[in-house]
Amino acid sequence: VYVLDSVRGSVTCFSSTAYGASMMQAVRLYEQGMYAESEALWEELLRQNQFQELAYDGIAKALLARGEYARSLPYFEKANDTYWYSKAFNEYRVEAVRAALPTVFAIAAILLAVLVTVKKLLRKRGSQKEKRPGAVRLAFSTMAHPISGYDEIRYTKQYSSFLAGAILAAWFLFSMIEYQYTGFLFNGHKPDSINVLLIFAKTIGLFFLLIFVNNALSTFMDGESTLRQLWISCAYALMPYLLLKLACFGLSHALSLEEGVWITVLNGCAVIWLVWQVICAVQTMQQYTFGKTLASLLFTVVGLAIVLFIAFLFFSLLQQVWSFVRTVFDELMLWQ
């Protein structure tokens, strides 16, 4: 490339560097589908520039062409190539399943034998007196039978603050793990951009804000639940949601891009199940009718929006006051 400079009256000649020449040659081979021939060039380019995504993609396709599916996956991930990552993962999964089948069948047979043995031992011991279900057992019963489960909890007054707190802590911790370690094909977040405070606000903070708003509304809607009953029962409502989200997390490491619809379906089921659990919890604890429960939840969402708007105005005003005080302080310092 020749560049004319009329001011200086000169001609400057630009020629490609060794790196540029290697890049052009590697790209030419890559576009022709000659991945194996371009592999050495890509490796040399990566030694000079570790942030060259096309080099990772070229090496990954060379490994894929040789049938080295497991080795190609990290390269496709660094190249951010979800399409070919999914193709390589499909082939790798077939090999992994074939290799693991004997072990899986052996473990399943052992577990089945242990289960049968335990059942026989329990049968020999005979029937015992039926024990009154504890707080933990009642909490888990709400997943399958939410209405009767919450009603029994309210009647027996067996609330476990420890279990409810553990559920909320698990939700917060799992949200961080999900953000960071969801499978590459289904993770739209950057691992280095995690904000723990934001995740805390979206989980624990949002949960208690909704609880406080709903509890405040219950004063005007003749609700019978206490604040403790309300937050514990709503924490119990998170259990099936967390279980389905955990299943989605596991599937994100086991499914290809084309099979991602199952994760979408499970996520939808998790949200629907959560909404139904919350409706049952609020209706039972507050002793509302179904229609009144829906109205209460709708007003709760509206109240949450109002609280967030007021909080935004407050922090905006606080920022303006701080800016004014800082400006006055700087002006006073200049006068000295």
Where are the regions that the model predicts?
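Selected alpha-helical membrane-embedding segments in polytopic membrane proteins
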Residues: 129-228
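Hydrophobic alpha-helical transmembrane segments and adjacent short intramembrane/lumenal linkers
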Residues: 198-200, 210-317
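Conserved beta-propeller blade signature
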Residues: 1-3
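TPR alpha-solenoid repeat register
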Residues: 21, 55, 88-89
